[in-house]
C-alpha cells in the first residue's frame, strides 16, 4: 500500500511538471519595489520612463506618506527620489496623510516629471481631515522635487499633465473630478468647468488643446488660445459613447499623429480610437473590436502606445482554461496599420525568488497573495496589474500588487541600430564614469587632505598652464567660492607663513605638456605648495610631470587621446568635480560648511556673492549633517550619467541634423563659426580635430569686445553654431540678426523672458541642464552644488564633431 501511495505521489508531481499550458507565456523579470515605500504592497497608476531611461514608480503608504522610486534598468538599483511629506513639509498621519501617488507621472520635454498626491482611506476612529492633494514635480536633472501647492482643498489628485511650451498644467482631482488649470508663471490654479468622469486623465493634442472625458463621457476640450471650454458628444458606430456603469474607467493615450486618442475601459476589452480633431458638433470614434475575449475583463491604466505605433494592453480575464484557477493576465497588441489584434500571452515571472513568499519562520508575509503558480510550476499574477508603459526601446514595464512589483518585459524590445560615432563617444564617457566611481576612495582621500589644508588657512588655486580644468573649477555655480590664489576669504596680506605653507596648486593637461610646464611645476614645488595633477599616465610625455606632482589623478585616456573623440577635457572636468565633492563632504564630517557659488543667472545670485565672497570662509547660518565618504561624488556621477543619457535619448536626431548641415557647408568650402560661451570653450573649440570645420569666436553677452569681434570676423549670412548656456540673450540675438547668421543653437532652458529668444530658432538642440546649473542638492543647504554644464557642453560638442568628421570622410 505504501509503495502504491508513493507511486501516485510521484505520478502527480511528474504530470504536474510535464503539464503544458494551453496558452503562450510572456516572461518578465520581477523587481520588488522598495518595501519601505509602501504599506500594503500596493501602488496605482504611477509609472513612467524618464528622459534618462530610468523608470519612476509611485507608491502608497496608507496613513503615512507616498513616494516616487527611481529604478535603473542597467543596474536594477532603486532609490527614493520623492518623499511627499518631506517636500511638502508635512508630518500628518492617518487619513490626513498624503497616502498615494496615483497619477500617471507625466514627463515633459524638459525631463521634469509631474505628479500629484492623493488621500488614502479613513480607518475607524480616525477623525483627521485630509487637506487636499499636492501638485509635485521631480527634476532628474538636479535631483530636486518641488511642491506647487494644493489645486483644490480636500480633494486628492488623480491626474497631472503639463504643457511646458505654454507654461500650463492640467489637473484632475478626486474623489470629485474637478478639471483644474495651473499657470506656472502666475503660480495660480483655476477651475476649467465641466465635472469629469472618475479617474479621468488629460491629453494635450498637437495643437495645444487639452481634452478630457466628462462625467457622461462627452469630450471636454480647452483651447488655451481662446481660453474657452467646449463639450461635444462622442459618436461610435452611430451611437453615443456613454458610461454604462461605475467600473467603466477609461485609460487613453495619444498617438504620434497628435490627434488620435486610443482608449480602453477597465471593464471592457474593446479598443476605441477617438479623433480629437473632429469638426462639427460631434466627435468621431471607432470601435476596433476586442483586444481579448474572456470573462470579466479588467484593464487598469494598462494601455500604452509603443514607439513603433503598436498599442499594447494588459487585460486580466477569468481563467476558464482548466489549467489552474483564478485570473490570467494577458498582454495584447494591436497594429493600427494592419488592423490586427494579437494575444501575445499570459504574464509569467522569470525569477519567482524575487520575493520571499515562504520565509524560514513559516509565516506567509502579509499582502503577498497577488501571485499564484500554475500546474506547470509557472508563477503568474493572480489579482491586479496597475499600470503598463512601453519605453523608447519597446521594453514594457508593468506594476503588479501583492507584493508591489515592477515587472520588466523585454521580449518585444527593439534591437537598436549599430552605434554611430556620437553614441560610441558618449558610451566611452560612461565607461570613464564607471572607472571614476570605482576610484572614489582616492578622491575621498584627496578631498580630506584638501579640506584639512583649507582649514589650516591654505589656498587652493591654479597657475594657468592652459588646461580646461583650470577654467572649469573656478567661479562656477555650486562650486567652492574661495578657489583660486587670487580669491582668498581674507586679505592676503594678513596670511601667515604657516597658512601659506598649506597652499595647494591644481595642474592639469588636456594634451601634451608645453615646453616649460615641467620647469614651472618644479617652481611651484620649490615655493612649498602641494601640487595635485590631473592627466593621463598613458601619455609618456607626462611621465616626469606626474612624478613631480605630490598626487596625481589619472584620467586613464589613450596616450595621445582619441581625436576625434577627445576625452581628456571631459574626463578631467568630471574628475575635478568629484574631487571637489569629496572635499566638501570632508568639511561636513568636521562640522564645517564652506561658502559656495550661486549662479549669477538667478535673480539673487549676485546678492549671494556679495554676502560671502572674500568675506566668509565657513557658513554660520547653515547646518549640514556629515556626508559619508564617497556619497557626494557618487551623487554627482549619478547626475552626469542621467544628463548624458537624456542627451543621447532625446537630442541625437537634432545633433545628426546639425552634422549634416555643417558637413554640407564644409564640403562647399565654407567654414562654420562657433559662437562659444562658457568656462572651458577657449581651450577646446577649434583646437583639435574640429579645426577641419570650426572657427571659434567667443561670444559672452557681457563682454563688449567679444561682441565686436563677432561683428568683425563672422561672415555675413554665414552658418553659426551657438554653443551657449541658458537661453539666448537679447544682445547675442540682435547680433545674429545683424549678421543674418544661419544659426544652429545648442543651449538649455531659461525661464527669464529676456533670455527666451532661443525659442525663435527652429534649429535648436537642448543641452538639457536645469536652470541654475548646479545639480546635487544636500540637506540643510539652500542651493544645489556642482554644475554639469561644462561637461555636458563639451560632450555634446565633441559628439557633434565626430559625426561631422564621419560625414567628411
Which positions does each model-derived feature cover?
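Surface-exposed loop and turn segments in beta-propeller and other repeat-based domains
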Residues: 31-36, 82-97, 149-156, 196, ...
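Beta-strand-rich domains and repeat architectures in extracellular enzymes and scaffolds
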Residues: 33-66
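Repeated scaffold domains used in trafficking and secretory/extracellular systems
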Residues: 41-46, 89-105, 154-161, 196-207, ...
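Residue-level detector of Asp-centered blade-edge/turn motifs that repeat once per structural unit
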Residues: 49-52, 107-110, 162-166, 205-207, ...
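Blade-loop segments of beta-propeller domains
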Residues: 77-110, 118
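Short, conserved, GDST-rich strand-edge loop motifs in beta-rich repeat architectures
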Residues: 115-132, 314-329
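Blade-level signature of beta-propeller repeat domains, shared across WD40, Kelch, NHL, RCC1
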Residues: 376-417
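Glycine-rich phosphate-binding loops that contact phosphosugars or nucleotide phosphates
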Residues: 449, 455-588, 667-670, 676-806
Amino acid at each position: 500500500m505504501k509503495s502504491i501511495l508513493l507511486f501516485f505521489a510521484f505520478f502527480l508531481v511528474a504530470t504536474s511538471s510535464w503539464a503544458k499550458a494551453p496558452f503562450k507565456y510572456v516572461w518578465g523579470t520581477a523587481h520588488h519595489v522598495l518595501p519601505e515605500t509602501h504599506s500594503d504592497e500596493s501602488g496605482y497608476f504611477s509609472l513612467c520612463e524618464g528622459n534618462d531611461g530610468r523608470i519612476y514608480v509611485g507608491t502608497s503608504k496608507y496613513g503615512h506618506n507616498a513616494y516616487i522610486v527611481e529604478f535603473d534598468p542597467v543596474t536594477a538599483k532603486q532609490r527614493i527620489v520623492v518623499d511627499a511629506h518631506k517636500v511638502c513639509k508635512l508630518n500628518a498621519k492617518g487619513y490626513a496623510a498624503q497616502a498615494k501617488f496615483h497619477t500617471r507621472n507625466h514627463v515633459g520635454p524638459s525631463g521634469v516629471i509631474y505628479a500629484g498626491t492623493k488621500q488614502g482611506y479613513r480607518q475607524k476612529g480616525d477623525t483627521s481631515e485630509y487637506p487636499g492633494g499636492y501638485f509635485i514635480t521631480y527634476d532628474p536633472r538636479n535631483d530636486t522635487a518641488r511642491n506647487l501647492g494644493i489645486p483644490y482643498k480636500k480633494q486628492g489628485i488623480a491626474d497631472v499633465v503639463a504643457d511646458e511650451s505654454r507654461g500650463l498644467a492640467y489637473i484632475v482631482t478626486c474623489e470629485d473630478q474637478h478639471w483644474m488649470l495651473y499657470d506656472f508663471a502666475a503660480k495660480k490654479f483655476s477651475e476649467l468647468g465641466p465635472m469629469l468622469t472618475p479617474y479621468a486623465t488629460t491629453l494635450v493634442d498637437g495643437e495645444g488643446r487639452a481634452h478630457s472625458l466628462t462625467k457622461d463621457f462627452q469630450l471636454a476640450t480647452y483651447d488655451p488660445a481662446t481660453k474657452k471650454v467646449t463639450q461635444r458628444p462622442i459618436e461610435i458606430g452611430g451611437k453615443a459613447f456613454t458610461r454604462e456603469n461605475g467600473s467603466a474607467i477609461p485609460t487613453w493615450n495619444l498617438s504620434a499623429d497628435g490627434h488620435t486618442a486610443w482608449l480602453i475601459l477597465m471593464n471592457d476589452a474593446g479598443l476605441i480610437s477617438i479623433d480629437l480633431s473632429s469638426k462639427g458638433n460631434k466627435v468621431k470614434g471607432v470601435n476596433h473590436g476586442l483586444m481579448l475575449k474572456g470573462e470579466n475583463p479588467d484593464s487598469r491604466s494598462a494601455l500604452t502606445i509603443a514607439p513603433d505605433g503598436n498599442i499594447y494592453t494588459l487585460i486580466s480575464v477569468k481563467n476558464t482554461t482548466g489549467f489552474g484557477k483564478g485570473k490570467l493576465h494577458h498582454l495584447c497588441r494591436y497594429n493600427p496599420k494592419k488592423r490586427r489584434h494579437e494575444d501575445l500571452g499570459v504574464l509569467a515571472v522569470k525569477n519567482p525568488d524575487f520575493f520571499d513568499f515562504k520565509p524560514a519562520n513559516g509565516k506567509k508575509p502579509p499582502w503577498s497573495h497577488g501571485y499564484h503558480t500554475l500546474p506547470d510550476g509557472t508563477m503568474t499574477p493572480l489579482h491586479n496589474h496597475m499600470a503598463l508603459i512601453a519605453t523608447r526601446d519597446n521594453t514594457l514595464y508593468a506594476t503588479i500588487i501583492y507584493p508591489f512589483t515592477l515587472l520588466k518585459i523585454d521580449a518585444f524590445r527593439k534591437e537598436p541600430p549599430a552605434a554611430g560615432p556620437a553614441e560610441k563617444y558618449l558610451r566611452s564617457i560612461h565607461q570613464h564614469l564607471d572607472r571614476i566611481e570605482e576610484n572614489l576612495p582616492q578622491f575621498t582621500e584627496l578631498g580630506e587632505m584638501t579640506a584639512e589644508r583649507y582649514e589650516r588657512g591654505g589656498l587652493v588655486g591654479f597657475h594657468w598652464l592652459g588646461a580646461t580644468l583650470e577654467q572649469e573649477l573656478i567661479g562656477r555655480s555650486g562650486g567652492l567660492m574661495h578657489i583660486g590664489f587670487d580669491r582668498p576669504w581674507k586679505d592676503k596680506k594678513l596670511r601667515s607663513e604657516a597658512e601659506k605653507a598649506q597652499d595647494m596648486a591644481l595642474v592639469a593637461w588636456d594634451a601634451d605638456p608645453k615646453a616649460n610646464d615641467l620647469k614651472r611645476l618644479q617652481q611651484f614645488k620649490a615655493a612649498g605648495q602641494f601640487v595635485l595633477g590631473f592627466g593621463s599616465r598613458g601619455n609618456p610625455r607626462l611621465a616626469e610631470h606626474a612624478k613631480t606632482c605630490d598626487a596625481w589623478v589619472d584620467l586613464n585616456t589613450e596616450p595621445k587621446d582619441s581625436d576625434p573623440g577627445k576625452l581628456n577635457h571631459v574626463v578631467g572636468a568630471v574628475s575635478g568635480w568629484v574631487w571637489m565633492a569629496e572635499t566638501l563632504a570632508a568639511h561636513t564630517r568636521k562640522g564645517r560648511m564652506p561658502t559656495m557659488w550661486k549662479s549669477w543667472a538667478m535673480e539673487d545670485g549676485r546678492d549671494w556673492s556679495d554676502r560671502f565672497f572674500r568675506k566668509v570662509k565657513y557658513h554660520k547660518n547653515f547646518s549640514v549633517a556629515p556626508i559619508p565618504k564617497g556619497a557626494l561624488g557618487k551623487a554627482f556621477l549619478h547626475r552626469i550619467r542621467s544628463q548624458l543619457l537624456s542627451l543621447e535619448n532625446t537630442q541625437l536626431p537634432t545633433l545628426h541634423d546639425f552634422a549634416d548641415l555643417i558637413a554640407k557647408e564644409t564640403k562647399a568650402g565654407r567654414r562654420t563659426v562657433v559662437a562659444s560661451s562658457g568656462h572651458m570653450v577657449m581651450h577646446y573649440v577649434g583646437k583639435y580635430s574640429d579645426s577641419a570645420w570650426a572657427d571659434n569666436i567667443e561670444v559672452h553677452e557681457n563682454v563688449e569686445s567679444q561682441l565686436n569681434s563677432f561683428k568683425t570676423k563672422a561672415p555675413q549670412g554665414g552658418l553659426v553654431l551657438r554653443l551657449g548656456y541658458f537661453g539666448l540673450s537679447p544682445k547675442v540675438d540682435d547680433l545674429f540678426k545683424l549678421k543674418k547668421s544661419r544659426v544652429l543653437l545648442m543651449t538649455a532652458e531659461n525661464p527669464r523672458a529676456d533670455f527666451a529668444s532661443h525659442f525663435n530658432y527652429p534649429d535648436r538642440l537642448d543641452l538639457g541642464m536645469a536652470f541654475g546649473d548646479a545639480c546635487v542638492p544636500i540637506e540643510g543647504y539652500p542651493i544645489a552644488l556642482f554644475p554639469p554644464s561644462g561637461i555636458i557642453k563639451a560632450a555634446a560638442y565633441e559628439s557633434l564633431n565626430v559625426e561631422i568628421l564621419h560625414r567628411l570622410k
